[in-house]
Amino acid sequence: ACNKLGLKLKVVGDGPDYKRLKAMAGPTVELLGRVDDAHVKELYAGCRAFLFPGEEDFGITPLEAMASGRPVIAYGKGGALETVVEGVTGTFFKEQTTDSLIDALRRFETMTFDKHKLREHAEKFDDEVFKARIKAFVEEKYNERNGVQK
């Protein structure tokens, strides 16, 4: 999709398919392999968006991108639906096909995103915030069940 649109794409990570993917990557795609955390932060800082094409139960990398003020273009299944907000923190593509991704990339080009809203949204998933929300929920349910009023 990025090759067809002439967009640069940097891919981070390795795995069993690395050599195969590197061989089929076109002129605008660069596979970087495994990189350290400092380099990942530099990549987030220098990118226009983070592309999240996989389906995972909960992906932390889209939140890392948002915390860096970068929107996410994600496959609209799995954990991305919990972390990406259409039009606010990114956009989705519906199928894992070149055409669907091209549509999302073109749509993305017409969108604008507020870096501060992206960061605020990512902070909602911070460990301490999450723990505090869980604790408050448990306390509320305990109090309801035991007739305790605040």
PLM regions: where:
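Short alpha-helical donor nucleotide-sugar binding micro-motif in glycosyltransferases
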Residues: 42-47, 134
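Short alpha-helical segment that forms part of, or immediately flanks, the ligand-binding pocket
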Residues: 41, 63-67, 81-82
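Short hydrophobic beta-strand element within catalytic cores of glycosyltransferases
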Residues: 67, 71-75, 84
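Nucleotide-activated donor-binding/catalytic signature segment of Leloir-type glycosyltransferases, i.e.
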Residues: 19-38
